[in-house]
Curated annotation (Swiss-Prot):
GO terms for cellular component: HslUV protease complex. This is ATP-dependent Clp protease ATP-binding subunit ClpX. It comes from the Bacteria. ATP binds at residues 119-126. The keyword ATP-binding applies. Gene3D superfamilies: 1.10.8.60, ClpX chaperone, C4-type zinc finger domain, P-loop containing nucleotide triphosphate hydrolases.
């Protein structure tokens, strides 16, 4: 039990874990010799929930079922039920293959790398990160735009394996069962349909370089990274069992898919739907390998990515959930910032809907939500530290639309006061 010895606060009780006083927390629970505050209790509950999730996915000989994987993905990623199902089945089969490959020699199971296709801000990267976290395997991310063929300025594809090795603390065995996520994979598409006289070192050349490590090869990885230390001893990493997930927005692919759809439907009975009348994510659901070839991926590269998961555009309801539901939701983050000034930040439900609609109009998906909130709250965050007596700030739909200023509630007034009823 923690008490202060000064005469002014000798009766003040303190949390034995975080040291906060009874005046700084909502509740202080007493034990035989200790006190614990409500904040520490919540933290303990979070730790227990995480432990329960890890024990759930480590059941059944270490292979989570697709439903178990999907259930955990639901806790972190809003929407995208189809992509979650595809990923859950693919990852389950991949690790089942690894655990049982030595038991049966009659049938060799091939590796199924995954291609994620979806609009910007739809959750591709978050899905890959969450998968690695719940499976407790080494994980690394690479940006395809920085990769070049060996011998040219830029990163070698072997650097991807080096990053994976580093995330596994140089444990080669663990790294060989890891997950690699390559983002912006659409940016290494072939620059033109016709073979060029000059080498395409950051497009088709990178696709060729990625082929071997994605299918399975023993890569020689320099522990200190690349070309600057030519004399160092190389580590041998077998990439056969590393799961590769490639993601990209594939801007313009929807036009190729729509054009193919129009060419196969002719006559008076053909149902013609203008591309602008269909959302990008809906069109992506009809992607075929031939569309990816036309986009600029080489046939061998498409063949190394047999599992294709398409993500849909996030609708207004999904974006509203993203704003409020996750543990680190944006609204919660800004509310925490305002709490530091002892001010409560409140968003009207219509305001959240207006923010979601703005993100849809800008076609930035979930990634654009922060910039929208930042612009809405900029003036308020600029003014508040210099104002006294403000107890609460209320954001309405009109504030989001730019026709009003935020409402301020002052501690010494019961009515809601606005700095200005309308913006100039």
């Amino acid at each position: 039990m923690s008490k202060v010895g000064t005469s002014d606060s000798k009766n003040t009780l303190y949390c034995s874990f975080c040291g906060k006083s009874q005046h700084e927390v909502r509740k202080l629970i007493a034990g035989p010799t200790v006190f614990i505050c409500d904040e520490c209790v919540e933290l303990c509950m979070d730790i227990i929930r995480e432990e329960n999730k890890s024990s759930l996915v480590k059941s059944r000989d270490g292979i989570p079922t697709p439903k178990e994987i999907c259930k955990v993905l639901d806790d972190y990623v809003i929407g995208q039920s189809h992509a979650k199902k595809v990923l859950s089945v693919a990852v389950h089969n991949h690790y089942k293959r690894l655990n049982h490959q030595t038991k049966h020699n009659d049938v060799e199971l091939a590796k199924s790398n995954i291609l994620l296709i979806g609009p910007t801000g739809s959750g591709k990267t978050l899905l890959a990160q969450t998968l690695a976290r719940i499976l407790d395997v080494p994980f690394t991310m690479a940006d395809a735009t920085t990769l070049t063929e060996a011998g040219y300025v830029g990163e070698d594809v072997e650097n991807i394996i080096l990053k994976l090795l580093q995330s596994a603390d140089y444990n080669v065995e663990r790294a060989q069962r890891g997950i690699v996520y390559i983002d912006e994979i659409d940016k290494i598409s072939r620059k033109s349909d016709n073979p060029s006289i000059t080498r395409d070192v950051s497009g088709e050349g990178v696709q060729q370089a990625l082929l071997k490590i994605m299918e399975g090869t023993v890569a020689s990885v320099p522990p200190q990274g690349g070309r600057k230390h030519p004399q160092q001893e190389f580590l041998q990493v077998d990439t056969t069992n590393i799961l590769f997930i490639c993601g990209g927005a594939f801007s313009g692919l929807e036009k190729i898919i729509s054009a193919r759809g129009r060419s196969t439907s002719i006559g008076f009975a053909a149902q013609v739907l203008a591309p602008e009348d269909r959302r990008t994510g809906e069109i992506f659901r009809h992607v075929e390998p031939e569309d990816l070839l036309k986009y600029g991926l080489i046939p061998e590269f498409v063949g190394r990515l047999p599992v294709v998961a398409t993500l849909e555009d996030l609708d207004e309801a999904s974006l509203k959930k993203i704003l409020t539901d996750p543990k680190n939701a944006l609204v919660k983050q800004y509310q925490r910032l305002f709490e530091m000034e002892n001010i409560e930040l409140t968003f009207a439900d219509e305001a959240l809907g207006a923010v979601a609609r703005k993100a849809i109009e800008r076609k930035t998906g979930a990634r654009g939500l922060r910039s929208i909130l930042e612009s809405i709250l900029l003036e308020t965050m600029f003014d508040l530290p210099g104002l006294e007596g403000v107890e609460e700030v209320v954001i309405s739909r009109e504030v989001v639309e730019g026709t009003a200023r935020p409402l301020y509630i002052y501690a010494d007034r019961s009515d809601r006061t606005a700095e200005s009823s309308a913006s100039a």
